Structure formats: structure tokens, C-alpha cells
């Protein structure tokens, strides 16, 4: 009997054990990452030929303690390598694992290689050559703490390499994992199988191999045992001949039908080539088609299974589209595949929840480094009633109510950018803003006490509900995560798309960009303040400090300001401000834009203005500023500098976002200034719930006429 070890992906050990026992293996013992088992010579070859789930099959040789590199060398050399293979065979060493003395896997492999070569030369035999690409013999060494396990790799290349797949998509599944997904899906051989997002066709091809009794190793050209001294060519020939005969009979007898779809014609071409290479082209029909147009190819035929590995996203900006895709996929399944089974394999259980289906079974597995889940669903024949798991129902109802009221108000006001939801419900801590026919969802960072998986699930529910309530295409939704800003974070670039579009705010037109920056180019809560500035500016010299994209200057210019001066430290935002001014026909020498540290400029300026708008940061310690700034601590110093620039009958509109800001009235009186709070006058309906989003003041000289 041969004692072997079959490795597999984490989570598939039990499935592999059942497969090996079905092949006739004895004494099967599961360990993490594989199964130890015992077989005769014939069953050894059959397990290599027929295992659909094993990654590799190893013949353990010995174990040795490794407290020094010499221990490793001697432990390997103790094996009679010339009895394993002859000098004319090539070999390679795969070494994994580190400890305190073997700190580099390449060094470990080198010591093993030296020990093997020396075992030949010590017997005055020619030294075998190393071939890292396609050796006759592969030696596998795994170092776990202070123990090295040494084995012959009978597989050669990984067993997932069946030989049919020269063409793959962007994110292919390994064939042995695909086979496991098929086996766990609930699909029964003889029934139809549909993959609506098939990519390079691996799931369908593996299923067709099962249905047609085709051995997964039948097309492999190279094995790790053919250079082994104990290789029995006659026995292997019998195993191979039997596999060919079973495949010939199986493809003639199978009644299963397989259907694969993908929206990329090039990917479908690759899938067809792979199926042809596998000898299964006649069983699988591949069609170029968007999943959203999917219907049941056997609407009047037998009940089958829909099986797929749908896309998932690691980038934040891909999530709205994927959430919408999964929601639509769930509706398609319920509409066209009643009575069928559905099985989906994904690295994102949150996305699977968007199907609004209740899973009957689920399995876990690793796909490389990714933790994945496979969920099986039984689709009702005649679906009725509410879907399983109404997503964010409270949020959806509140959003629906808000939109009904605010959309009408916005049309009457002549504005296209406004907030429709502002963390109204504690469980759904997001802000939702409309920008024309676009929507931005800003997720406020969850407290550390909230389970990240739970927070992510709620966000997915919010996105799905928003798309549904607003009847919004996913490509019109932008997702942002907002955390407490520090320093220059408001200037942080998020992307390079450069997607600007025009929106209306009263009589002004403004450019917004929803994707490239944390902020969009217009602060919605200051909308009424900008309108007031426009009404106050006729015939006046207007100064806009910390101007951002200059939207206040646009309103002042349209209101008839004699001059506008727009100052910000960011060149990017000043260029944006210039575009906004030009968009509204405001150009010429009377409309100045200056890049400067606003606080330094204030201290040095000797100009006079009638109307000044200043909206400084709550706190800033930018490297480009000479010193830190705290609006609560430093607002009197700020007012002292502003007073010097303010004409006798002039007005400063001072706003900030500091919660709990307290105006130093005594200090203002000492400066000869009067402050009148106008916060309630600058708050609009869409920010009615958040009275502390900003505070706003009109500052004048004491005794102003």
C-alpha cells in the first residue's frame, strides 16, 4: 500500500475525502489543507487520473528536525535518492515555510538541492540536472516550525491544470475549485446547467466532464511520477486506456445540456476554444449576451440549475453597479427560472444578500487568498408575496418620503443640487445628495464598536434601496466614504476621471465633479448664504477667502458686484473657480483669482472691500500655511485682520462648520465690531434636521450707518 497526501483548497477537505473514498482509498484522514490516504499502486494512478478536487498528490518520504541548515541538509541526504530516480532525470525543488534558521525559501531549496545532488556524487554517480520549468521529478519540502516534511510530488504540475484551458478571462477559477463548486451546487447530472456569467467557461466545462464521465487528468501531457524509479508504465497505460473508454461512452450517453452566457464576445470565443480543447464542444452552447437580458433557454423543458461565479468589486466605485447587478439578477431568477436551483459562489456575501433570496445551504471555501461563500437557493415555481429579506425598508420609506417633499421644493427654488437624506435614521448613517440626474451617497465612517461586516451590509442595503426608490441606473450613483477631515484632506484627489458637468443653483451655473475629489465642488449647506451674497453685492467690491471653487464669487458677480477677488491656496480649485466664472460670463480684470495662504495674505493686504465672505476651515495645520489655525481659538485675530480691509459701511459674512462655536462678543466689542448671527436664515429645507452643520454671522463696524 502507498501512503499518500492529497492537498486541496481550504474548505474542500471533506469533499476531497469523500471523493478519494469513492475511488477506493483507505484510511482517509482529514488535516487542514488536505487528506492523508492509503491506496494500492493501481488506485494510486487512478486517484491521480480521476481526482477532480486535489491540488497535488504527494508521496511522503520522511520528516526531519531542522534546528540548523545542516540538519536540513543531512535529513534530505539520508534519503536514498538514486533509488528514487536516475541521474539522467531532471529534478526541481519546491520549498515552502520558514523558521529561525531557514529564513529564505530559496536558500532552503538550495540546501535541499545540494543534498540530493551530493547523494548521487557520493556514490560516484553522475549528478542530475535541475529543470525548474518541467522536471521529471519534483521534490516538495514543507517546513513547519522545526520540522521539515519531504515528499515526491507525483502530480508534476498542479492537478488543476487539466490541459484544456489555454484561454482564460480576467479572474479565472482554478479547475479543481470549479469542480468543487459544481459538486456543491445541487446540480444533478442529466439535468440542464446554465451559467449566466460564464467567463472562460470553467464551471460549465468541469460540469460537462462530470456528466460525461471524463477523467480530469485525461489530457495532461506531463506527470510527476513518470521519472520515478517505481513507475509502472503498463499499469498506468491500463488506467489511461480505461479513462479513454469511459469518456467515449460517457459523452455518447450524457443527456445533460449546458448553456453559458457572457456579455464579452472575446471571452465567449475563449470559452468555446476551451470547451473544444476539452473535447466537450458538442455539449456546451456559449452565447454572447448580457446577463440582464437573460431568459430561460429551456422555459418549457426540464428543471435545472443556474450556477455562476458573479463579479465582485474591491474598488469602492464599483460597488453600486455590482449591487444593482445582483438585485437585477435576483429578479431575473424569480421571473424566468421558477422551480430551478440557483447556486452562486462569491467573495462578497453582502452582494449575495442583494438577490433578496433566502439561501437553503451555504458552504465556505478559499479562492486563493480570498474567503468565499457558496450559497444554494431553491427558486419558487410561482413566486408570490414579499421578497425574502426586505432590504433597508425603514431607510427606503424615509427616503421615499423625503424625495417626494424635496424634489418639488427644489424645482420651485430652481436648484439641481440638494440633500434628500442626512443620517435621518441611526442605523443608516449616510448622506444622500442629488446632483441633477446623479446621486452621491456619502457613508460616514462607522464607530469602531460597529462590526465592519454589519456596517458594510447596511451600506449595500442602502445602495440597493436608493437605486430602487429613485429608479436610478447604477452608473449614475457615486459612493464616497467620509471621515473626519484632517489638515489638507479636503484637497485629496480620489481619482483622475475628470468628469465635470454643469448644474444650476438659482440663477448661477456651476461645474461639479462627483468622482475625483472627496467634495464635489459645491457645499450644499451654504446655498442660501451664496444667494444672500448675490443679493448684497450690487455695486460692491467683493472678497472671497478660502474660496474653494469660487461659487460664492459667481453669485456675487451675477448680483452685480463691481469687482470680485477670489483667493484660495489650491491651484486646482482656483482653476475650477475660473471655469465657474467663465461659465457665467464673468471674466476680465474686475474678476481676480489669486493663489495664496489666506491668513498670510490677510495680514499683508492693504486693499479695501465692501463685502467679504470667509468660510475658514475648523482646523488646519497645512505645511503650506505658516502656522496652525483653530477657528474657535483664532477667530478674533481673524476679525482683527478683516476689520482693516473692511470699508466703513462694509459687511463680513463669516461662516464655519465648528459644532458648538462660541462667538467672543466681548472681544468683538473691543475690536469695534458687531456680530449678528444669521444661521437660521441660511439653513434650507434639505438641511432642516442638521441645524449644526454650520453657523453664520454678519460682521459690521460698530456704529455702522
From Swiss-Prot:
GO molecular function terms attached to this record: 23S rRNA (guanine(2445)-N(2))-methyltransferase activity; RNA binding; rRNA (guanine-N7-)-methyltransferase activity
Every THUMP domain range: 43-154
Top-level taxon: Bacteria
Subcellular location: Cytoplasm
S-S bonds: none
PROSITE patterns documented for this protein: THUMP, UPF0020
InterPro entries assigned to the protein according to its UniProt record, in alphabetical order: 23SrRNA_methyltr_KL (IPR017244), DNA_methylase_N6_adenine_CS (IPR002052), RlmKL-like_Mtase (IPR000241), RlmKL-like_Mtase_CS (IPR053943), RlmL_1st (IPR054170), SAM-dep_methyl-trfase (IPR019614), SAM-dependent_MTases_sf (IPR029063), THUMP_dom (IPR004114)
EC number: 2.1.1.173, 2.1.1.264
GO cellular component: cytoplasm
Reaction(s) catalysed by this chain's protein: guanosine(2445) in 23S rRNA + S-adenosyl-L-methionine = N(2)-methylguanosine(2445) in 23S rRNA + S-adenosyl-L-homocysteine + H(+); guanosine(2069) in 23S rRNA + S-adenosyl-L-methionine = N(2)-methylguanosine(2069) in 23S rRNA + S-adenosyl-L-homocysteine + H(+)
A family per Pfam: UPF0020
Record's keyword terms, sorted: Cytoplasm, Methyltransferase, RNA-binding, rRNA processing, S-adenosyl-L-methionine, Transferase
HAMAP family named among the record's database cross-references: 23SrRNA_methyltr_KL
Function: Specifically methylates the guanine in position 2445 (m2G2445) and the guanine in position 2069 (m7G2069) of 23S rRNA.
Family note: Belongs to the methyltransferase superfamily. RlmKL family.
Protein name per UniProt: Ribosomal RNA large subunit methyltransferase K/L
Species: Erwinia tasmaniensis (strain DSM 17950 / CFBP 7177 / CIP 109463 / NCPPB 4357 / Et1/99)
Gene from which the chain derives: rlmL
Amino acid at each position: 500500500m502507498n501512503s499518500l497526501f492529497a492537498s486541496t483548497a481550504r474548505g474542500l477537505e471533506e469533499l476531497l475525502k469523500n471523493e478519494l473514498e469513492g475511488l477506493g482509498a483507505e484510511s482517509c484522514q482529514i488535516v487542514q489543507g488536505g487528506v492523508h490516504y492509503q491506496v494500492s499502486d493501481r488506485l494510486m494512478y487512478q486517484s491521480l487520473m480521476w481526482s477532480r478536487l486535489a491540488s497535488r498528490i504527494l508521496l511522503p518520504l520522511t520528516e526531519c528536525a531542522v534546528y540548523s541548515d545542516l540538519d536540513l541538509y543531512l535529513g534530505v541526504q539520508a534519503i536514498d535518492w538514486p533509488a528514487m530516480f536516475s541521474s539522467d532525470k531532471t529534478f526541481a525543488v519546491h520549498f515552502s515555510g520558514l523558521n529561525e534558521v531557514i529564513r529564505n525559501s530559496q536558500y532552503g531549496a538550495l540546501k535541499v538541492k545540494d543534498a540530493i545532488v551530493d547523494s548521487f556524487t557520493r556514490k560516484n554517480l553522475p549528478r542530475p540536472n535541475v529543470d525548474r520549468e518541467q522536471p521529471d521529478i519534483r521534490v516538495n519540502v514543507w517546513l513547519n516550525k522545526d520540522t521539515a516534511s519531504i515528499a515526491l510530488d507525483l502530480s508534476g504540475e498542479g492537478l488543476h491544470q487539466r490541459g484544456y484551458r489555454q484561454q482564460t478571462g480576467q479572474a479565472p477559477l482554478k479547475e479543481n475549485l470549479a469542480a468543487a463548486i459544481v459538486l456543491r451546487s445541487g446540480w444533478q447530472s442529466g439535468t440542464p446547467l446554465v451559467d449566466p456569467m460564464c467567463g472562460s467557461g470553467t464551471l460549465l466545462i468541469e460540469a460537462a466532464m462530470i456528466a460525461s464521465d471524463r477523467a480530469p487528468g485525461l489530457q495532461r501531457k506531463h506527470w510527476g511520477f513518470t521519472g520515478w524509479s517505481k513507475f509502472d508504465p503498463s499499469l498506468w497505460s491500463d488506467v489511461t486506456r480505461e479513462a479513454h473508454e469511459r469518456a467515449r461512452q460517457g459523452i455518447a450517453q450524457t443527456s445533460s445540456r449546458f448553456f453559458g452566457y457572457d456579455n464579452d464576445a472575446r471571452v465567449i470565443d475563449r470559452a468555446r476554444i476551451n470547451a473544444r480543447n476539452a473535447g466537450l464542444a458538442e455539449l456546451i452552447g456559449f452565447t454572447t449576451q448580457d446577463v440582464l437580458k437573460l431568459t430561460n433557454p429551456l422555459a418549457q423543458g426540464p428543471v435545472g440549475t443556474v450556477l455562476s461565479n458573479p463579479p465582485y468589486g474591491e474598488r469602492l466605485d464599483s460597488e453600486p453597479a455590482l449591487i444593482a447587478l445582483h438585485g437585477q439578477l435576483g429578479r431575473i431568477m424569480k421571473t424566468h427560472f421558477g422551480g430551478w436551483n440557483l447556486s452562486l459562489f462569491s467573495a462578497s456575501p453582502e452582494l449575495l444578500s442583494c438577490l433578496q433570496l433566502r439561501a437553503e445551504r451555504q458552504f465556505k471555501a478559499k479562492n486563493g487568498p480570498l474567503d468565499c461563500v457558496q450559497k444554494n437557493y431553491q427558486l419558487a415555481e410561482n413566486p408570490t408575496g414579499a421578497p425574502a429579506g426586505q432590504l433597508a425598508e425603514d431607510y427606503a420609506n424615509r427616503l421615499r418620503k423625503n424625495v417626494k417633499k424635496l424634489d418639488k421644493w427644489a424645482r420651485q427654488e430652481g436648484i439641481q443640487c440638494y440633500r434628500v437624506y442626512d443620517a435621518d435614521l441611526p442605523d443608516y448613517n449616510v448622506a444622500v445628495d442629488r446632483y441633477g440626474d446623479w446621486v452621491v451617497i456619502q457613508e460616514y465612517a462607522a464607530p469602531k464598536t460597529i462590526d465592519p461586516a454589519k456596517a458594510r451590509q447596511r451600506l449595500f442595503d442602502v445602495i440597493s434601496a436608493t437605486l430602487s426608490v429613485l429608479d436610478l441606473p447604477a452608473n449614475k450613483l457615486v459612493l464616497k466614504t467620509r471621515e473626519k477631515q484632517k489638515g489638507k484632506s479636503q484637497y485629496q484627489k480620489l481619482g483622475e476621471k475628470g468628469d465635470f458637468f454643469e448644474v444650476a443653483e438659482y440663477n448661477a451655473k456651476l461645474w461639479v465633479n462627483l468622482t475625483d475629489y472627496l467634495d464635489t465642488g459645491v457645499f450644499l449647506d451654504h446655498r442660501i448664504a451664496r444667494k444672500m451674497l448675490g443679493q448684497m453685492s450690487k455695486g460692491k467690491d467683493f472678497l472671497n477667502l478660502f474660496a474653494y471653487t469660487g461659487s460664492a464669487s459667481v453669485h456675487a458677480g451675477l448680483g452685480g458686484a463691481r469687482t470680485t477677488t477670489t483667493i484660495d491656496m489650491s491651484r486646482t480649485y482656483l482653476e475650477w473657480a475660473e471655469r465657474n466664472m467663465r461659465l457665467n460670463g464673468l471674466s476680465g480684470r474686475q474678476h481676480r483669482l489669486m493663489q495664496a495662504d489666506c491668513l498670510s495674505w490677510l495680514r499683508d493686504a492693504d486693499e479695501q472691500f465692501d463685502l467679504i465672505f470667509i468660510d475658514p476651515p475648523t482646523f488646519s495645520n497645512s505645511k503650506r500655511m505658516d502656522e496652525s489655525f483653530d477657528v474657535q481659538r483664532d477667530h478674533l485675530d481673524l476679525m482683527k485682520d478683516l476689520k482693516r480691509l473692511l470699508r466703513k459701511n462694509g459687511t463680513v459674512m463669516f461662516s464655519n462648520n465648528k459644532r458648538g462655536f462660541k462667538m467672543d462678543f466681548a472681544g468683538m466689542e473691543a475690536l469695534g465690531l458687531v456680530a449678528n448671527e444669521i444661521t437660521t436664515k441660511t439653513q434650507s429645507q434639505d438641511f432642516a434636521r442638521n441645524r449644526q452643520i454650520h453657523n453664520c454671522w454678519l460682521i459690521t463696524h460698530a456704529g455702522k450707518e
